[in-house]
UniProtKB/Swiss-Prot annotation:
The lineage of its organism: Bacteria, Pseudomonadati, Pseudomonadota, Alphaproteobacteria, Hyphomicrobiales. This is Putative membrane protein insertion efficiency factor. GO terms for cellular component: plasma membrane. It is a peripheral membrane protein. Coiled coil: none annotated. It comes from Beijerinckia indica subsp. indica (strain ATCC 9039 / DSM 1715 / NCIMB 8712).
Length: 123
């Protein structure tokens, strides 16, 4: 028996079951098993770009997830960003539905909002 992992979008609807999401995720998996495994992992980010796109599609659906993934691909080049770059947990509510490209971060470094707290201030 198969187990299905359900992912919720910002609207609360499951996105992993829709036909376009499943189709795009299968294409990504095909890429990972064929071309990516032959060439090797070359991505500058963690998670890799294909894993990032897969998670963005599963979490946010085709409409926003595709643009979030494309924005990540546009940053993955020798002069682009590098390092840990997670998929956003939720979409910006102020972005109009007909402008999904505004969900993606197209350039610039990842903004770190968390700062470690030191208990000993004498460091």
């Amino acid at each position: 028996m198969r187990r299905f992992v359900r992912s919720l979008s910002s609207t609360g609807r499951s996105q992993t079951g829709s036909l376009p999401v499943r189709g795009l995720r299968k294409l990504l998996r095909f890429y990972q098993l064929t071309f990516s495994s032959l060439v090797g992992t070359q991505c500058r980010h963690l998670p890799t770009c294909s894993a990032y796109m897969d998670e963005a599609l599963a979490r946010h659906g085709v409409w926003a997830g595709l643009f979030i993934g494309l924005a990540r691909l546009s940053r993955c080049h020798p002069w682009g960003t590098a390092g840990y770059d997670p998929v956003p947990d939720q979409l910006d509510a102020n972005v109009p539905r007909l402008q999904p490209w505004r969900h993606g971060r197209w350039r610039g470094p990842l903004e770190i909002t968390w700062k470690p707290e030191h208990k000993d201030q004498n460091l």
